[in-house]
UniProtKB/Swiss-Prot annotation:
GO biological process: cytochrome complex assembly
UniProt record similarity statement: Belongs to the CcmE/CycJ family.
Residues on Periplasmic side: 29-149
InterPro entries linked to this entry: CcmE, CcmE-like_sf, NA-bd_OB-fold
Transmembrane domains' residue ranges: 8-28
Organism phylogeny: Bacteria, Pseudomonadati, Pseudomonadota, Alphaproteobacteria, Hyphomicrobiales
Name this polypeptide is given: Cytochrome c-type biogenesis protein CcmE
Subcellular location: Cell inner membrane
Annotated heme binding sites: H123, Y127
Length: 149
């Protein structure tokens, strides 16, 4: 093998290695990314059962129901649409009706009940998750005071 052929083989091997590494990184990111949706987004474009997403909005008034165990059922709304949610675990101390919440999980087999494995609640009386507030402002259903922090 000549010097030129060796150099070409090393370059081709390096490019191949980099391509495989990039594909592995993209594959790993694709499995861990959870896209953010509001209930009205899901009403327009439903996602398939088992698809991991983040669902944000307000906890609907009168929707929180606690089972005998640690399972809680509630609904998330954005003023336009509502999505029923179940969560098994300990809720954040600041979780309550009418407050901002972001949940992460998957839709069940029926595609209508959202099974959350993570629930994030607002921090204080003036806070709403930025992505929720921005989307509600964009959709024209924002009823809060001031700007989202």
């Amino acid at each position: 093998m000549t010097r030129k052929q060796k150099r070409l083989a090393v370059i081709a091997g390096g490019v191949g290695f980099i391509m495989v590494a990039v594909l592995l990184v993209l594959f790993a990111f694709g499995q861990s990314i959870a896209y953010f949706y509001m209930p009205s987004d899901l009403a327009k474009t439903p996602v398939g059962p088992g698809t991991r997403i983040r669902l944000g909005g307000l906890v609907a008034e009168g929707s929180v129901k606690r089972d005998t165990g640690s399972t809680v059922s509630f609904a998330v709304t954005d003023g336009t649409a509502t999505v029923p949610v179940t969560y098994t675990g300990i809720l954040p101390d600041l979780f309550r009706e009418g407050q901002g919440v972001v949940t992460e999980g998957v839709f069940g087999a029926g595609g209508t009940l959202f099974d959350a494995d993570t629930v994030l609640a607002k921090h204080d009386e003036n806070y709403m998750p930025k992505e929720v507030a921005d989307r509600m402002k964009k959709d024209g259903v924002w009823k809060g005071e001031g700007e989202a922090k």
